[in-house]
Amino acid sequence: MSKKDKAQIKSSVSSKNPTARTAVQLTLLDRLNNWFEKNDKKVFYTLLFLSTLFSLLLFDSKVSDGGDDSSYIERAWSFIHEGKFPYFQGPGYPLALSFFVKMFGLNVIALKFFSVACQFGFVWVTYLTFRKRIPYVVLFALISFISFNNFIQYYASQTFTESFFLFLQSICLYVTFKIIDAINNDSSLIKGFQENYGKWLLFGFMFVLLAISKSIGFVAVGGVVLYFLFTRNYKQIVYAILMFLAFRFLYQIITTAEFGANTSNQLEMMLRKQLYKPQGGHEDFSGMIDRFFNNFDTYISLHIYRILNPVYKHDYAITDIVPPLAYITTVVLAVFTFLSYKKNKFIFFSSIYLISLCGGIFLGVQAQNMQDRLIIIAMPLIFLVLFYGMYELVKKYSMLQTVFILFASIMLLVTIGKSTVLAKQNATALKKNLGGDVYYGFTPDWENFLKMSKYCADSLPDSENVLSRKPSMSFIYGNGKKFIGQWDSPENPNADSVLMGWQKQNVKYVILPNLRMNPKKNNGKIINNIHRMILPVYQKYRDKIRLVKTIGTIEKCELYEIIY
C-alpha cells in the first residue's frame, strides 16, 4: 500500500490522536469517531447481538404466498433425492440449502434458520469489510441500518435468496478491498498477480459463487472492473476478468459433466415481455429502454424510500411512484460518488459497484414485477453512500453536525421502534407456529389451499398427478408430494384444448382454490386462472369432472377428479 493510500485511509477514518491536535478543537463528529474507535468491539458485538435478537423476534415460520421461497426448498430437495441440479434461477442457494434439507427434511422452521445464520454472517463480514476504511460514525450507522431495518430482517427468516446473497456479497467486497489494499502499481503484470495470487483465486471463486446464486450476480464483477477502469488499475482488470472466467469455466465443465447441460435459458426469460407468458414475445431495444426507466422510477422513487424511511407504510400503490424524485435521488448519489472519488476509495468503489448492480436490476427484471426484494441486495450500499455523502457535507460545520447526528439518532430510534412493533405483532403467530399450528397466520383462502395440498398427499396415490396454482407450496405442505403447476391460462380456453393439455401432463386431480387477488381483503375477487380453464370443461363435459373434497366454507378450496 502506498503512503498516499495510507494517508487517505487515516484521514477518512478520522481517528487521529487528540494529543497531536492540541491546538485544534475537536468537532462533534471527531469526538464520536474517537469514542467509537476506542469502543468499536463493544459497540459492534452489542449491535450484532441485537441484530440476531431481532432476527429471532421477527422470525416468520411460514412460507410466503409468492412461491419462490418454496421453490428453492423444492429444488434443494430434488437435488438431494433425485440428483436434479437446480440450474433455474441460480443454483447457489438451493445447493447450500440442500445440506440443511438433508439434515432436517422439509421442516420449514429449521430451514429458515439458515437465513438467520446468513444475516448474522452478513452483519459480521460487513463490519470487517469497512472497519478502519470508513469513518466510525458511518460504519456504525451502516451496521445499525442492516441490523434493525425490518425489510432486511424480514429476509433473515425467509428461504428467499436475499440473506444468502447479502452474505456472499459482503465476502466478495471484503476480498476486493483486500486486493485494493495490496495494489502495487510498480509491479509487472505477472509479478502483480504472484504477489496476491491467493486473494485473486478467492476473488474468482467468490464472484462465481455470487453469480450462480442470483442471476443479477453476473453484473457484480462488472462493477469491480468498472472501478479499476476509473482508477486506472488496468492490470487488476485483467486479473479480475481472467479469474472470474477461469472459475466460471471450471464450474461449467464440472456441472455439465456431472448433471448435464443447463436447459433453462435465463437470458431468454430475462428478455420476455412477461416472465410467465413466453407467448407474449421478447423485448426489442426500445422495449428494454422503457423497462430500464420504468424500473428506475419504481425502485428509486418508491422502494428505496419505503425501505429507508421507517415511518413509510408497507403497502403501496402505483400512484406512489414519483419519477422526479428518482432523478433528484440519482443526482444526489452522483454528487456523493464524486465526493467519494476524492475522499475515500472504498466508498467510491461501493458507488461504482452500486451503479453496476442497479443497472443490472433495472434491465434484467420485467417492469411489472415491482417486488421490493429485488432492490434489497443494493440497499446497504445505497444507505452507505447516502450517509457518507451527508457526513462529508456537514463535517466542516459544527451546527450542521449536531443537526445531522440528531436526525440520524431519531431515525435510528424510529427504526428500532418500528421493528419492535412488528416483533410484538409477530409474537402470537410465532408462538402458534412453533407450537405446531403450521397454518396459523395464513388467511382462510391460503389455509384451505394448504390443507387441501396435505389432503392430496395423505389420501391420493403417489402416482396420481395433481394440478396446483402454487405447486411448490403444495409440495412443502404436502410432505414432499410433487404437484403440477398451472400459473396462467390461455386467452380463450375451450374444453377440448384444456383436457388435451392436462392429459399430456397426466393430470388426474385439480385443486381449485379461491385465492384472493387482494391478499389483505376478501372482496370476492380471486385469482381465477384455473377456474377459467375448468369451467368450459364442466359446461361441456360435466361427466368428466367429479368433486372429491371440499375444505372450508369461507374461501373454500375444492378438489376435482378429471375423468378422461
Regions from the PLM with identified roles:
Residues 123-126, 305-350, 356-358:
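Hydrophobic, aromatic-rich transmembrane alpha-helices
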Residues 29-31, 181-182, 219-249, 253:
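Perimembrane helix-loop-helix junctions
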Residues 234-314, 320-329, 414-422:
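Membrane-lumen/periplasm interface segments of specific transmembrane helices
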Residues 113-135, 170-175, 332-339:
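Transmembrane-helix motifs of polytopic, lipid-linked glycan transferases
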Residues 61-75, 84-99, 106-109, 214, ...:
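Extracytoplasmic catalytic/substrate-binding loops of multi-pass membrane glycan-assembly enzymes
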Residues 41-44, 137, 196-205, 242-245, ...:
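Signature aromatic-anchored transmembrane alpha helix within multi-pass, membrane-resident enzymes
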Residues 410-471:
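Membrane-embedded, lumen/periplasm-facing catalytic core of multi-pass transferases
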Residues 77, 155-156, 162-170, 210-213, ...:
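Hydrophobic/aromatic-rich transmembrane helices and adjacent perimembrane loops
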